[in-house]
């Protein structure tokens, strides 16, 4: 009865509402409603009579995915390039492929084949996400392994799993705290994966869309350079009216003032001298406001340059005071977005470079004493613990401070590589260095304990090579040959060993030490029972890595044969040079 009462009341209410409407509308609506009901009932009865597996699906149409555009291949490209392009697009679903033929670049381009021999073709591809890039890189590595039977060199690919070795290293670092370089600065782990395939000089870069836009690798591998500055728009606070406009105005003023200071600094570097140093300093101080990090950094750069030219205008204490003023500035302390740990690392490296540029004004002990006091003071402004030994450049500069020279033209890897580009240099080096053997031993042990403490870890190749050149220029030949032999044994590839042989001959010819040259050419040149240049040269099919390398060795050996023509070992080297 209750149910009937409810149904009756609902019917009465509907009847009352219908009676108040016009008759035409009621009859029309009732007719349409009746017709629709008849049609729906007919359709329902028809569908009910058809089995479910024979009914037509009433689903939305499937969207057709856009085909990936495959770029045109360069002329005379190898078949492997076509295989990788099809693999990246068809199998892995990567988009926005772009291919660069480095043989088409001009000779003075840093990525041309004249400047480097590792890369011939570069492929840039975009992935949908970090997981997509990781999966594509993983499959690409397996493909190269099974198809070409060798493992490619992949960088930037990291999984979430942690190995046992990594766990042990992290456990050792618990008490030290996180290193300053542990921050990813908002960059994902697999946003940029580089794969050196080792096949026909093909290098593949897999990037996310945001990372590809920020890195702009297209400009690196292309001949067209665009000098456009991009500034990020300031964030607008929705709670404060006109906050975004006001913030953008202040930011533009800081950039404008920084540009003015940069022009003064550039003008001094190009046209400044001993007499005009005071004028440039006064002009810079008049424009300096101290409202941004960039202004303080540019002031440090200018004062350092003036001090190296005219120490009477700017002394060492004034340079250090710039850094202390920056960290005690209330204006900078009130600004957000400043990573002070990064600034501390940056200023420490710049201060070490300044100590190196002082040459013989201070001894190695005095320079390291200044560095010790500087690090103790600047670490007071750090909220977190910073491990400077995790930075490779810190270790390299720390070793560089163990010796001084009148000129900063000491031989290193960069200078020797320039000699190869010039196809040889027969003039001996007149630069001598003063090496503090005790400090060198202490720094070496300090690096070993703080960074290379594991039994399985040794000094990296670049650091051992730097130490080796220091020992050779300091006349410590026993330690030079010990490190030289250790580096040669660690090189597994024949082409790397050939390059190391060439730069060794160039280094010894520049140092111009007769005993060292005789030791190399008699004991290691054609030794049948041990390591020798002739054996590695034969194993490399009597070829060098480049024509510049061949001509550099030919010219230097010819000069050695002419200078020491009375010695059999020099004449043998000259005969080999004639055959090149």
Curated annotation (Swiss-Prot):
Gene Ontology terms: cellular component: mitochondrial inner membrane
Compartment(s) of residence: Mitochondrion inner membrane
Pfam families named in the record: RsfS
Superkingdom as given in the UniProt entry: Eukaryota
GO biological process: mitochondrial gene expression; mRNA stabilization
Organelle targeting peptide span: 1-38
Main location (coarse class): mitochondrion
Topology of this chain in the membrane: Peripheral membrane protein
Entry keywords, A to Z: Membrane, Mitochondrion, Mitochondrion inner membrane, Transit peptide
Signal peptide region: none
Role description: Probable mitochondrial mRNA stabilization factor.
Family: Belongs to the ATP25 family.
Annotated protein name in UniProt: ATPase synthesis protein 25, mitochondrial
């Amino acid at each position: 009865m209750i149910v009937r009462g409810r149904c009756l009341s609902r019917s009465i209410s509907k009847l009352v509402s219908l009676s108040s409407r016009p008759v035409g509308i009621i009859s029309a609506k009732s007719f349409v409603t009746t017709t629709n009901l008849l049609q729906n009932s007919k359709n329902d009865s028809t569908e009910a009579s058809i089995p479910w597996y024979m009914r037509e699906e009433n689903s939305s149409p499937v969207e057709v995915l856009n085909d990936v555009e495959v770029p045109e291949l360069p002329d005379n490209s190898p078949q492997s390039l076509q295989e990788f392009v099809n693999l990246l697009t068809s199998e892995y679903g990567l988009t926005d492929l772009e291919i660069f033929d480095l043989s088409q670049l001009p000779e003075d381009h840093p990525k041309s084949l004249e400047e480097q021999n590792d890369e011939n073709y570069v492929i840039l591809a975009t992935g949908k996400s970090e997981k997509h890039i990781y999966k594509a890189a993983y499959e690409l590595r397996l493909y190269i392994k099974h198809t070409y039977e060798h493992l490619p060199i992949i960088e930037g690919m990291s999984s979430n799993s942690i190995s046992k070795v990594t766990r042990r290293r992290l456990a050792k670092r618990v008490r030290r705290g996180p290193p300053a370089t542990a921050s990813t600065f908002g960059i994902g782990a697999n946003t940029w994966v580089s794969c050196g395939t080792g096949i026909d000089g093909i290098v593949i870069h897999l990037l996310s869309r945001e990372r590809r836009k920020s890195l702009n690798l297209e400009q690196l591998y292309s001949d067209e350079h665009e000098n456009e500055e991009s500034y990020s728009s300031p964030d607008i606070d929705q709670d404060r009216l006109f906050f975004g406009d006001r913030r953008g105005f202040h930011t533009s003023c800081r950039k404008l003032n920084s540009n003015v200071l940069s022009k003064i600094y550039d003008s001094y570097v190009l046209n400044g001298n001993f007499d005009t140093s005071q004028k440039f300093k006064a002009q810079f101080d008049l424009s300096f406001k101290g409202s941004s990090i960039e202004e303080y950094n540019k002031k440090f750069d200018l004062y350092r340059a003036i001090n190296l030219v005219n120490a009477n205008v700017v002394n060492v204490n004034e340079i250090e005071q710039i850094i202390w003023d920056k960290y005690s500035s209330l204006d900078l302390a009130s600004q957000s977005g400043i990573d002070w740990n990064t600034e501390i690392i940056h200023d420490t490296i710049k201060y070490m470079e300044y100590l190196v540029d002082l040459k013989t004004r201070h001894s190695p002990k005095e320079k390291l004493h200044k560095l010790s006091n500087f690090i103790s003071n600047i670490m007071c402004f750090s909220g977190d613990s910073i491990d400077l030994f995790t930075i490779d450049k810190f270790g390299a500069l720390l070793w560089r401070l163990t010796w001084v020279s009148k000129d900063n033209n000491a031989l290193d890897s960069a200078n020797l590589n320039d000699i190869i580009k010039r196809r040889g240099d027969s003039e001996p080096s007149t630069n001598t260095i003063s090496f503090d053997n005790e400090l060198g031993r202490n720094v070496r042990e300090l690096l070993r304990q703080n960074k290379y403490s594991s039994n399985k870890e040794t000094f990296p190749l670049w650091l051992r090579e730097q130490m080796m050149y220091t020992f050779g220029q300091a006349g410590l030949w026993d330690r030079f040959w010990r490190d030289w032999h250790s580096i040669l044994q660690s090189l597994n590839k024949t082409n790397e060993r050939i390059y190391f042989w060439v730069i060794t001959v160039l280094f010894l010819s520049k140092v111009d030490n007769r005993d060292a040259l005789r030791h190399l050419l008699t004991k290691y040149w054609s030794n049948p029972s041990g390591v020798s240049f002739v054996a590695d040269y034969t194993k490399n099919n009597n070829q060098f890595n480049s024509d510049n390398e061949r001509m550099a060795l030919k010219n230097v050996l010819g000069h050695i044969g002419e200078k020491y023509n009375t010695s059999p070992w020099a004449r043998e080297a000259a005969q080999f040079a004639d055959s090149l």
